[in-house]
Amino acid sequence: MPQISPNAPLEGNVSPPPTQPHLDDNLHNGNGNGNGIHSSSSNINKHGSNINGNNDSNRSSPAKSPKRPVSSSFRIQNTSRYDNDEEDLAASEQVAGGDRQVPDYWQQRNGATTGATSGRQSRAISPGYLDNMSENSEQPPVVPLVRSKSRPEISSAAASRYNNLSYWKARRVVFYRNGDPFFPGVELRYRPGRDVTSLDNLLDKISPKMDLPRGARYVFSMDGDRKYHLDELEDGAFYVVSSFKAFKPASYGKKNGMWYASPGNQGWGSKPASRKPSIMEADLGTLSTTSGSIKRSAGRVIRIINNLDHSVQCRVLLNLRTSQPFEEVLEDLGQVLKINGAKKMYTGTGQEVRSFSQLRNEFADVDTFYLATGTALIAGSPIRRSRSRPSVVAAAPILPTDELPKVPLRGARPRSKSRPRILYAPESEILRPNGEYTMLDIMKEEPTKVTIRGLRRTFYPPVHHAPADNSPPDKKLQLQWVHGYRGIDARRNLWVLPSGELLYYVAAVAVLFDRDEDAQRHYTGHTEDIMCMDVHPSRELVASGQKAGRDRKSQAHVRIWSTESLQTLYVFGMGELDSGVTAVAFSQLNGGSYILAVDSGRESILSVWQWQWGHLLGKVATLQEGLSGAAFHPLDDNLIITHGRGHLAFWHRRKDGFFERTDIVKQPSRSHVTSVQFEPDGDVITADSDGFITIYSVDSDGAYFVRTEFEAHNKGIGCLIMLGEGTLLSGGEKDRKIAAWDSLQNYKKIADTKLPEAAGGVRTIYPQRPGRNDGNIYVGTTRNNILEGSLQRRFTQVVFGHGRQLWGLAAHPDDELYATAGHDKHVALWRKNKLIWTIQTGYECVALAFHPFGTLAAGSTEGHLLVINCENGAVMLTLRVCGSPLNCVAYNQVGDMIAMGSQNGSIYLFRVSRDGFSYKKVNKIRGSQPLTHLDWSMDGNFVQTVTIDFDLLFWDAKSLSPERSPIAMKDVKWLTNNCTVGFLVAGQWSNRYYSTTNTIVATCSRSAAHDMLASGDAEGYLRLFRYPCISPRAEFHESKVYSGMLACVRFLCGDHTLITVGGTDASLMVWDIVEE
């Protein structure tokens, strides 16, 4: 049985070395635990910031790390994170300006610090630390180093490092993804000690580029040798990066027997040179005609405008060296502007352009040209101007009408009234509030290009929109209420605190619900879903363990926090726990001084900690799949019981930290031990998935035997709880029964009761008043509800939650009401914190919409439309629209038309009566891609939708046809902005401030005042931007309380409240929007 000895140096207990030579040895040691703590003075002067070496990456263990004496393991602890951004320097100076005395930078570099500052902390057991509300730190927060103004003399020990100048040379390293032979590799060029200060720092840089399930944590050579230190990486070498410790051999860098070319270089697979194209769409974010990157003789970026419709225009890169005739180029340009047979090009002053040489020479300073089929330029009317203001520059210079020959406009196509000409803008829309934003500025605004799932999409700016502000909004989100309960996949997750509050968890939030005051408090220290929880014997502290996220900053760990102050007291397991925490439990006999944690990784490592001191007492790999729980024996703090699928074992911890295992259930066994309780004399009570309760006793030789076994329920038992008077309560998951058994009379049944079918099976039972024998209990169910009652009276609902995936959400247009619907076939109406009604419809509803007069429409996965009366929840009408799911539903502004987007890609339009209860099918507009979001235009003439591939499509509701030109639709005003793509919401994609790359925005909502944008992504992040949100530099306020996808977000009437739904446990959360 693989075991890990705990006899390793503990964090904070390493003393500083007695003499300077030990420090000199350490500076020359290649160990990555303290790597990258030196930097040349020129680098410090250049960046103006301190250097930080992240304290170890790669999760080194004592068994694999080089063994050295404690003195040689001494490390200077670096404290300030290296960054090229100048704002980090200001932040460092602000912290350093406090009351704490900070040693000089060069003194710390040369080992002149003493005490805990210079003590190397062991990463072998990754002991805990005070949290200090820092979610992403792997070490205790310390004050950044401050560089002194005058540089002292460098000691000989530190200066000796500079003798090897090759160490500071730039290195080029290529990394491959573990187990993926087709991954082309990520190339990184860096200077050790400057660009990259430690192996941890290097892994942080490449994690966003590797798309690993838990981020980059381990580095291996191509032969599988693990690299622990930055010094081990050689220039020009190739390495493999993994989230886990297991290396997978593969032909990295090869495909079909040929090596890939190095990233950034052309290899054998490069495409042959092709004929130079005459025109191509210009990437305005990277091309500049004035920067000298493209010579005038080679090509030009120009703006071309349709002479017949000035709102149709485009920026193109024109190749002046093409072999095509000028006339063919004009025809190609005409196709871009939807002009058939374009033959003429004019400047804004009416001069005709006849050749490429004129574009290079005579019209070199002209950037705007008009294309026409006739012989002259058609002038538009000038912009209306106020007499009290100076003239505003027009979008393009136009010839006076009397100087142009009159040309008949037979070829001019009719224009829609919803597409205003850009030259007829009113004065109020021409100027920004500061009076300096003219129409010329609008014309210079370039289309936005966004890359989504590897495909580039272009969104065109409307002529009139509010000014973009990239600063974060002046309001923030504050969690106000959490609806629901995690009973669908969790056990032992409901308690009653001494204050009378109910304690349970939903998503990444621990909820403390006071029924008497009708109020909630929330502990939000976790960044991913909570997987397990336990209450300290004092009932004043709580330990909760979370799962691991996709990045390295959301690692699995356990947090111990106070129920009174909601402050984090201790965190442990960072870097030690793999993919999550299966179980956590406090010891009982010694008053909760010990705590155990079981890792949900492949080895299911059991570890025991003395949490007040941060000591790891021991750990062992159980190697048990399907392990679901663990607990200390109440009469022996060194005896631990683990249970799970086909597993029940006792672990006795010896004084040396090793564990002795005794298996009670012999392998193989199909039974799943679901719960464990104890009799007052120490005998063990277990419940299993077959409905049996078993009592184990110990004989005089210390061996365990089955004393009693009986069938308590038809099928699986969800939980057991032993009350103080010796009564055992058991709850069935399948038969929904709760039974009471008298342990003093050989477990004779006292009474039983059955929960309603709508409530679900029993997941957890807890007495309402612990210590009292009144029989009142709380019950958590498998359908995410909490009930209260007793075996003598009926159960009533305390907390309602949707039992399966929750997708549908709609906000009432004129009231603080909102409705939810999910795959559990329930539709519910809420008023902020209160449930008004809930109905079971018989259909899995995924889309909701409110009629302007209060009717609720619900679209189902079977293609039905349900019309519900909001007064009483009665279903008034059921229509079969199609055979595919209705993913999005919306009424137009006046409520006389409803549009439904289907999984088959079509839009279905129905005429609606004034009261919203009568519907008549108008027609459908065929499409090809599944639709996910939908918005109506303000005038009710158009609909915009988003496909499953994030394409933005437009539909003409009057002509019942798709609108093919996104440029023609750029000035349409939309009633809502629920579509996740578009010019005014492009800043929520590929934002530079996101912690992860390739973020997929799943939902968004615009406030009624058009000043805020709420956005939710597939990783569970909720963000609040200013609206419009155009630039990828737009800043935001962020919260993360979901691990799964945030399915839908909506503002309530008045813009004071935000509602979110989603996650893996169908959680519903209410957020207050407060001043920052």
Curated annotation (Swiss-Prot):
Subcellular location, principal: cytoplasm
GO CC annotations on file: cytosol; microtubule; sensory dendrite
MF terms (GO), sorted A to Z: microtubule binding; microtubule stabilizing activity
Protein's cellular compartments: Cytoplasm, Cytoskeleton
WD repeats: 525-571, 576-621, 623-661, 668-706, 712-751, 801-840, 842-878, 881-920, 926-965, 996-1035, 1041-1076
Keywords (A to Z) from UniProt: Cytoplasm, Cytoskeleton, Microtubule, Repeat, WD repeat
GO biological process, one term: sensory perception of sound
Polar residues bias (residue ranges): 70-81, 107-124
Record field: compositional bias (Low complexity): 36-55
Record-linked PROSITE patterns: DC, WD_REPEATS_1, WD_REPEATS_2, WD_REPEATS_REGION
Keyword Repeat: yes
PANTHER family the UniProt entry points to: ECHINODERM MICROTUBULE-ASSOCIATED PROTEIN-LIKE CG42247, WD-40 REPEAT PROTEIN
Similarity-based family: Belongs to the WD repeat EMAP family.
Job of this protein: May modify the assembly dynamics of microtubules, such that microtubules are slightly longer, but more dynamic.
The protein, known as: Echinoderm microtubule-associated protein-like CG42247
Organism: Drosophila melanogaster
Record gene name: DCX-EMAP
